[in-house]
């Protein structure tokens, strides 16, 4: 065991061995808070362990096989990812099952329940509509078309109105720190490559009644590309269509074909301008 002190309180960490089946021995990390810590009075006589183990769970929904994985012991409220479309991209809205709550992926409403540490699948008494599959927004697939009016009154018809262009859809908000941190990188790419066919469309996740603030923000930050704003926060229609659950969320799209050319892995950071140049050079 090792002790570490901070702020007059001491925490102990150690490890132990567990006898497993078939004569195997496992190791588990343990820790204990200072029994004099007033913030954790309920844990003063409790020895805790790190959940450094997990389980793979396979099950069938209406005869179709699915699987998921979770770490530690199962419990009600645990969120499990089920890769419904097998593309390896996680959708927190359309591919998540919460243990103890009903869900419908295939036509029948089910519920996962935990009884004495065992997870079981049951048919739910509550009937829900089928959760639609998430859009397959991976490189090589097509983006979702849309038509909206920008904050400045410009009619945006995407991708139809961007023939011959390379377009970056930028889902962001004025309250989003990581989004703001990316603005200099987007500006650098736009300033460098706009005349060569690079376009940006901003989709704001700002709240209701903030249209003037968004206009003021983009003017002050010198962001000349069109901005789409509905004032619906996380329920903005394009966010729902594109299954956006975190921002910044970005996609690079061929305006002529609608094909997705790159996702966030290539579209963030100071290397954005160079990457856009590479894409344009191959057209």
Please state what every model-predicted region is.
Residues 142, 165, 245-247:
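Short, small/polar residue-rich loop motifs at catalytic or cofactor-binding pockets
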Residues 163-164, 195, 223, 244:
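Active-site acidic short loop of glycosyltransferases
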């Amino acid at each position: 065991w090792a002790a570490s002190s901070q702020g007059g309180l001491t925490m102990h960490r150690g490890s132990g061995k567990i006898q497993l089946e078939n004569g195997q021995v496992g190791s588990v990390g343990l820790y204990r808070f200072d029994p004099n810590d007033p913030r954790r009075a309920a844990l003063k006589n409790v020895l805790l362990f790190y959940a450094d183990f997990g389980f793979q769970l396979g099950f069938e929904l209406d005869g179709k096989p699915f699987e998921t994985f979770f770490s530690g012991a199962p419990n009600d409220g645990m969120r499990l990812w089920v890769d419904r479309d097998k593309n390896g991209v996680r959708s927190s809205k359309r591919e998540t099952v919460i243990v103890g709550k009903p869900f419908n992926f295939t036509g029948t409403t089910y519920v996962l329940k935990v009884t004495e540490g065992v997870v079981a699948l049951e048919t739910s008494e509550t009937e829900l509509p089928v959760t639609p599959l998430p859009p397959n927004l991976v490189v090589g697939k097509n983006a979702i078309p849309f038509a909206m009016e920008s904050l400045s009154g410009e009619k945006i018809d995407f991708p139809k109105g961007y023939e011959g262009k390379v377009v970056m859809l930028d889902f962001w908000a004025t309250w989003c720190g990581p989004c703001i941190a990316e603005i200099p990188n987007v500006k650098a790419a736009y300033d460098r490559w706009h005349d060569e066919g690079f376009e940006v469309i901003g989709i704001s996740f700002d709240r209701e009644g903030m249209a003037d603030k968004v206009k003021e923000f983009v003017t002050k930050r010198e962001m000349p590309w069109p901005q789409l704003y509905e004032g619906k926060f996380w329920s903005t229609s394009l966010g729902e269509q594109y299954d956006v659950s975190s921002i910044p969320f970005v996609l690079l799209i061929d305006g002529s074909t609608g094909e997705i050319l790159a996702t966030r892995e290539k579209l963030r950071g100071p290397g954005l301008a160079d990457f856009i140049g590479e894409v344009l050079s191959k057209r």
